[in-house]
Amino acid sequence: MKLPKEGDFITIQSYKHDGRLHRTWRDTMVLKTTENAVIGVNDHTLVTEADGRRWVTREPAIVYFHKKYWFNIIAMIRDNGISYYCNLASPYVLDQEALKYIDYDLDVKVFADGEKKLLDVDEYEIHKKEMHYSPDIDYILKEHVKILVDWINNGKGPFSQSYVNIWYKRYLELRSR
C-alpha cells in the first residue's frame, strides 16, 4: 500500500484483542511517514467510541505510531504544558481503510509536571483472562512498558519538547496553506 503523504488525512482505528472495534479517530493529519513510523496531529478531531458515543478532541495533539514498538504516544499540547497519554498496543498496520492497532488496556499518563501513572492495570488483568492474551503477548507488553518509561525518563522522541515543537510548528504551517 502507498504511504500517506504529509498533509493527507487518515482514519485511525483501535481494536481489542478479540477483534472488536474499540475507537475511531476521523481525519488525523499526517505530518510524516517512514517505513516504520507515522507522525500525525489530531486537532478538534471527531472520535467515535464502540458504543456509538462521539466526542471531539479538545486540544492539538501530536500522535506517534511505530511498527516495531508495542505502544503509541499522544502528546497533548495544553496551556500548562505538554501531557502525554501512551497506549500499550500492538504495532500498527496501515491499509486502504485506516491505520489500525490493537489496544491492550494498559496506559501510561505523563502529566505536564513530569509525574507518571500506569493506568488500567485491573482492566488489563480482566481482559487478559477474558480474551486469552498469550504469555508471549503479556511478556512483550510488560517489556514495552519498561521501554516506554525509559523513553519518558530520557526525553526520547515524542517526550522531547523540541520534537513536539517541531511537529506542532509543521502542523500550523500545513494548516495555514
Swiss-Prot record:
Enzyme active site: R23 (proton donor)
Pfam annotation, one family: DUF402
Residues annotated for Mg(2+) 2 binding in this entry: D105, D107, D120, E123
Sample GO molecular function, one term: ribonucleoside triphosphate phosphatase activity
Region forming the signal peptide: none
Lineage: Bacteria, Bacillati, Bacillota, Bacilli, Lactobacillales
Protein function: Has nucleoside phosphatase activity towards nucleoside triphosphates and nucleoside diphosphates.
Designated name of the protein: Nucleoside triphosphate/diphosphate phosphatase
Record keywords: Hydrolase, Magnesium, Metal-binding
EC number(s) from the headed UniProt entry: 3.6.1.15, 3.6.1.6
Cofactor field: Mg(2+)
Family: Belongs to the Ntdp family.
Enzyme class, first EC level, given as a word: hydrolase
Catalytic reactions on record: a ribonucleoside 5'-triphosphate + H2O = a ribonucleoside 5'-diphosphate + phosphate + H(+); a ribonucleoside 5'-diphosphate + H2O = a ribonucleoside 5'-phosphate + phosphate + H(+)
Binding site for Mg(2+) 1: N87, D103, D107
Protein's UniProt keywords contain Cell wall biogenesis/degradation: no
